[in-house]
């Protein structure tokens, strides 16, 4: 930046010096032939000065041409960079300032050249070689008109310059009247030569500084190109990674859909197994209920039989006790009768001894009594025999009842074993149901985990897509900035074209001067340089068009990428909706299965409660019947 400021100050000094020279040279000049040789020498010196100024202008144009690819590189760098926009803006602003200063210097050099051309016109008009100069002027004017026509087609500023040129011609005619002597002009020209040599030295230093700056800018352009290549590779890698991620995501979706189908098929199989197990459990439960009912009936019968046996045993005991008591009473009576007989016998013997007739009567009476007693004893013996027969029959019935009890016990044991088997089968069924429920819970948990994983993956993919959106928006912003910078570059190119056209005008003026001085070779070189400049301008226009095409292609690529991004986002949203719908369907199925299981369990519990109530009722009825049976034998 400091070098650019110094260069601008040098150019301003040169411009002021040229103005002072022009003011001094406007003095009247003499038209003597003796000073023509001096004038020729001055013209040659001015020719060398013009060549030096032309070289300086070429250097300035070369520096401008070198700056333009730097701007292009910076534009390309901006297209592919993701960060350091502030640094790039600073670089661009610095380069803009440098270009503006160089353009100012270029304009000042142009004005100095125009001033020198005017001065030469003044000198040449002061010569007596008017005929030759007029011919040359006519030729030059014809050429100038042709060139001006071309320039008028391109821009309208050259018309103003032509008007200024005509006004300056009028001023030269006026200035010729007031020209001074050639000696004073020669001295002043020598002073100017010395000053211009010093200025040339300064300009050489300035050119060296520009060369160093150009080298730095070339290094920066290379670095920027390398960074752009790195950014391109990174963007390509990102695109490849996004493509791979999309492929992996599609594969995961396919795998997830297959897993969902497998899970649904497994759930259906488990539902079929559950229905089979439930039907089997219902059959086992019905069989178990029948066995329980039969068991309860058998238990009731056993209890009734036991009660009947107990009652019969009690009756037998009562009968035995009654028979024992009756036998004891009979024995007592027999003993009492025997004792009475003995006593009677003793009394009879005594009475026989006393009263023999009465003894016979008493004997008859005793015999009758004994006969009565014997009849009573025989009747009681018959009753005892009948009781013994009843006891035997009761014992037979007891043995039969015991056999029946044994059979019933064996049946009860069989039923108990069957009940145990049924209980074991029911426990197995319960364990299976619990296992199935546990498996269903595990499946639901795994489903939920898979769903959470898929949600996390979807969220990560959505975050990546948001990042891609941010990168696309950043790229669009950069495109907008690049377009703005392109417009600025176009404006600068237009300014440079204007300056180059002005230089062409100056070159045309120099060509006129050189034709006046018969310097055709230099004119050819200048024409070649002008053609080169025109070619360079055309190249610049072509490069600008290429840049515009690149920008258009980039915009199309961005639009295409935006469309792809929208399509992918729509696909991802559709897939997410499908996943959510599948998850909701799975949850609904699981909830329906749970509701079915709960309804079945509630129905089973209700059936069990109903069976328990029925068993209680039957037990109560059996108890009532037993009570009635017990009350019936007690009533007689």
From Swiss-Prot:
Mainly expressed in trachea and testis. Not detected in bone marrow, bladder, leukocytes. Only weakly detected in tongue, stomach, brain and ovaries. GO terms for biological process: cell projection organization; negative regulation of cilium assembly. Residues 36-97, 141-220, 249-325, 377-484, 519-631 form a coiled coil. Keywords: Cell projection, Cilium biogenesis/degradation, Coiled coil, Cytoplasm, Cytoskeleton. InterPro entries: Odf2-rel. It is found in: Cytoplasm, Cytoskeleton, Microtubule organizing center, Centrosome; Cytoplasm, Cytoskeleton, Microtubule organizing center, Centrosome, Centriole; Cytoplasm, Cytoskeleton, Microtubule organizing center, Centrosome, Centriolar satellite; Cytoplasm, Cytoskeleton, Cilium basal body. The keyword Cytoplasm applies. GO terms for cellular component: centriolar satellite; centriole; centrosome; ciliary basal body; cytoplasm. It comes from the Eukaryota. Its main location: cytoplasm. PANTHER family: OUTER DENSE FIBER OF SPERM TAILS 2, PROTEIN BCAP. Belongs to the ODF2 family. Acts as a suppressor of ciliogenesis, specifically, the initiation of ciliogenesis. This is Protein BCAP. It comes from Homo sapiens (Human).
């Amino acid at each position: 930046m400091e070098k650019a400021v110094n260069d601008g100050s040098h150019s301003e000094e040169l411009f002021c010096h040229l103005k002072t020279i022009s003011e001094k040279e406007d003095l009247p000049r003499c038209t003597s032939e003796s000073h023509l040789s001096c004038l020729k020498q001055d013209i040659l010196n001015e020719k060398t000065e013009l060549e030096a100024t032309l070289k300086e202008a070429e250097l300035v144009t070369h520096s401008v041409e070198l700056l333009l690819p730097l701007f292009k590189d910076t534009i390309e760098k901006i297209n592919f960079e993701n960060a350091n926009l502030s640094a790039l803006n600073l670089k661009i602003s610095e380069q803009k300032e440098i270009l503006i200063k160089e353009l100012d210097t270029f304009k000042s050099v142009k004005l100095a050249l125009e001033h020198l051309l005017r001065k030469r016109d003044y000198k040449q008009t002061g010569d007596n070689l008017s005929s030759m100069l007029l011919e040359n002027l006519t030729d030059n004017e014809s050429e100038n008109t042709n060139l001006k026509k071309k320039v008028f087609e391109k821009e309208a500023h050259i018309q103003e310059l032509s008007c200024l040129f005509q006004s300056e011609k009028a001023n030269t005619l006026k200035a010729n009247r007031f020209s001074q002597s050639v000696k004073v002009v020669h001295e002043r020209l020598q002073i100017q030569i010395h000053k211009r040599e010093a200025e040339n030295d300064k300009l050489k230093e300035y050119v060296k500084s520009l060369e160093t700056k150009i080298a730095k800018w070339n290094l920066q352009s290379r670095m920027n190109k390398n960074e752009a290549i790195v950014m391109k590779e990174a963007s390509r890698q990102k695109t490849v990674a996004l493509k791979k991620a999309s492929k992996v995501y599609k594969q995961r979706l396919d795998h997830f859909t297959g897993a969902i189908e497998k899970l649904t098929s497994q759930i259906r199989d488990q539902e079929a197994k559950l229905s089979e197990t439930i039907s089997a459990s219902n059959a086992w439960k019905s069989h178990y209920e029948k066995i329980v009912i039969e068991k309860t009936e058998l238990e009731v019968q056993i209890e009734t039989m036991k009660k009947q046996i107990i009652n019969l045993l009690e009756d037998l005991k009562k009968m035995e006790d009654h028979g024992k008591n009756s036998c004891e009473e009979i024995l007592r009576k027999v003993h009492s009768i025997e004792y009475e007989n003995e006593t009677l016998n003793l009394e009879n013997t005594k009475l026989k001894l006393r009263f023999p007739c009465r003894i016979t009567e008493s004997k008859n009476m005793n015999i009758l009594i004994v006969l009565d007693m014997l009849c009573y004893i025989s009747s009681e013996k018959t009753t005892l025999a009948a009781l013994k027969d009843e006891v035997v029959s009761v014992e037979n019935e007891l043995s039969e009842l015991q056999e029946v009890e044994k059979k019933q016990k064996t049946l009860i044991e069989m039923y108990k074993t069957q009940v145990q088997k049924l209980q074991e089968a029911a426990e197995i069924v319960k364990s299976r149901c619990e296992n199935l429920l546990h498996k269903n819970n595990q499946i639901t948990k795994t489903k939920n985990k898979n769903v959470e994983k898929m949600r996390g993956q979807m969220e990560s993919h959505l975050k990546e897509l948001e990042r891609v959106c941010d990168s696309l928006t950043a790229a669009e912003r950069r495109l907008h900035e690049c377009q703005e910078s392109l417009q600025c570059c176009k404006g600068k190119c237009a300014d440079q074209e204007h300056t180059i056209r002005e230089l062409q005008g100056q070159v045309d003026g120099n060509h006129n001067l050189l034709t006046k001085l018969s310097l055709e070779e230099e004119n050819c070189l200048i024409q070649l340089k002008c053609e080169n400049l025109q070619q360079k301008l055309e190249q610049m226009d072509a490069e600008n068009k290429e840049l515009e095409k690149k920008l258009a292609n980039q915009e199309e690529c961005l639009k295409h990428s935006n469309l792809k991004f929208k399509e992918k986002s729509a696909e991802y949203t559709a897939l997410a909706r499908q996943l959510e719908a599948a998850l909701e369907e799975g949850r609904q199925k699981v909830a329906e299965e749970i509701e079915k299981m709960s309804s079945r369990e509630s129905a089973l519990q209700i059936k069990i409660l109903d069976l328990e109530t029925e068993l209680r009722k039957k037990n109560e009825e059996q108890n009532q019947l037993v009570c009635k049976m017990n009350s019936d034998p007690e009533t007689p």
